[in-house]
Amino acid sequence: MSPFAHPAFFYRGEDEYLATLLPFVRAGAAAGEPVAVALPTGNLGLIRAGLTSLDPEHALPGVRFVDMALAGLNPGRIIPRILLAFADAQRSRHVRIIGEPVWPGRTPQEYPACLQHEALINTVFRGRDVTILCPYDAEHLPREVLSDARIAHPVVIEEGRERASGPFSVDRALARGNEPLTHPDEARAFEFDDGLLHDARTFAILIASRLGIADEATSALSLTVAELTTNSVVHGGGSGTLRLWAEGDQLVCEVQDSGLLCDPVAGRVPPPVDRPGGRGLLLVNELATLVRMHAGTTGTTVRVYLDMQG
């Protein structure tokens, strides 16, 4: 039996939330297991308060707390920045992590990346001595989200009972998150190849300036465009199309090429230290507030959202 466990926990109300998560944390701490708790801001406060009320003097100081609404705003960086970073530092012991990447208020643009994140946990941590427990607010999340959670998790905990999830399928969950990306008519486009990479960056900064990007945000844009366009030239057929537009306070930068994305964990798992390259999408995930990808049969689209104010 694999030591890896990845249950979804469907909760209804604060009492059920605390009744399941607090014992999970305390049992891990009592066993000397490393424990990380990565939850959206309000729920993180609930767990902190609950642990303090149970043990006012110590409150389990060895537990690591992460605000998922900040560190995990872009779902593409949750695996490398939060989950792998914690688990890789504790390889000699069983690791417990609570991770809540989906909550009421996640936008429709963010959700497909959340679903793919949940599916990829199964791939990235297969065979690892890690338990990653994922709470879902069954009172307030749409029914479709709960259905997707059953597809992305091998086990579901609901109403105090743990059951195998019949619909579980990593491939199906990834496919459901692989939504086609359409761009608005007002998007400004630039066709590039290996001789126009510098021009692509210049074009991006010019358009972004017209759209109102702050000066301190241009370096992130320049790095993003450099990584995406270079990736298209090297791996995506030698050329591509760069598009930019604004959505509210976000600058959207998209690159489309004819390359086929063969590795679904690209940009979410650091390559071995002795392997040159392979870190471009990791960097983009760190810079962005959101990264969406669509892998089709005729090409790949990478869409990056950047804060206009940096």
Question: Where do the protein language model's features map onto the residues?
Answer:
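Non-catalytic sensory/regulatory segments that transmit input signals in bacterial signaling proteins
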Residues: 1-194, 203, 301, 308-310
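Amphipathic coiled-coil/heptad-repeat helices and related helical stalk/stem segments
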Residues: 21, 117, 225, 277-280
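Hydrophobic pocket-lining residues that define ligand/cofactor binding sites across diverse proteins
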Residues: 28, 208, 232
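Conserved beta-strand-loop-beta-strand hairpin that lines the nucleotide-binding pocket
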Residues: 179-182, 230-310
